[in-house]
Amino acid sequence: SAVTGDACFYYENLATGVCFGHAADKPVVAASVIKLAVLIEAFRQMDADAVRANEMFVIARTDKLPSCGALNYLHDGLCVTFRDLCVLMTILSDNTATNLLIKRLGIGNINDTLRMLGAEKMTLNRLLFDREASSRGIENYITAREAGLLLKRLYDGEAVSGPASEDMLSILKDQRLNGKIPFLLPHSVKIAHKTGEDDGITHDVGIVYARQPFIVCFCGEHVSPPEFERAMQDITLMLYENAERIR
């Protein structure tokens, strides 16, 4: 109640099925959480042999995007595999890797897979840093509940195949941007999660592998990021401590 702006929240206990939320069905601008949908479609196409994990991409200067990631800072002409693009997109939120993947996979295919998984509001409408589309009000959208749905599909081994779902979770567990959901938790706790940020926007959605594992999704738009991120940290710690007490 102390957080200003559109603060959306979803929680699901993966041991008991108990779930609750606040504004969990409200669409908000996705920022980098949309990369979770790109990751799932990438692994679906690898599973279907539509793309190879070792397919090579040459990173041109014109491919490079600012802000998050590493590729923008590396030499032109660098060769990177398809799977490595998936890893960079996920653990460093690399924007260059993301747009290369979206172009290879197809926006329509990504959205079709979202619908197949049961996500009706989560939508990829444009590439990242598409200023022309953004100026016309075209954005990518998520909801806290549907981010949780994708995480549940991964946890249950149903996002693609069981092995592909497990592989994606292993990548998400290697996340390097850990200032939100994981911040107050013991370093030994495994957390598979994806963050997102933009002006007045901060998100983090993930699975916390406590004694009773749980999904927690925070999506904040028109918020003060420091204020909402502190709320994320405090709420996650409370949920974790409760999950550790339950036998």
Say what each PLM segment does.
Residues 1-24, 208:
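A short, well-structured edge-of-sheet supersecondary motif
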Residues 3-6, 99-151, 155:
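Mid-domain, small-residue-enriched loop/turn segments at the edges of structured enzyme/sensor domains
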Residues 17, 29-57, 216:
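Active-site SXXK
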Residues 19, 104, 149-179, 188-190, ...:
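Structured C-terminal helix/loop/strand segments within mature extracytoplasmic catalytic/sensor domains
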Residues 21-28, 75, 136-137:
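A short glycine/serine-rich beta->alpha loop
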Residues 48-74:
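Short, glycine/proline-biased beta-turn/loop segments that scaffold the active-site neighborhood
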Residues 64-99, 140:
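Conserved catalytic neighborhood of penicillin-recognizing serine enzymes
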Residues 81-85, 93, 97, 101, ...:
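Stable alpha-helical elements in mature extracytoplasmic
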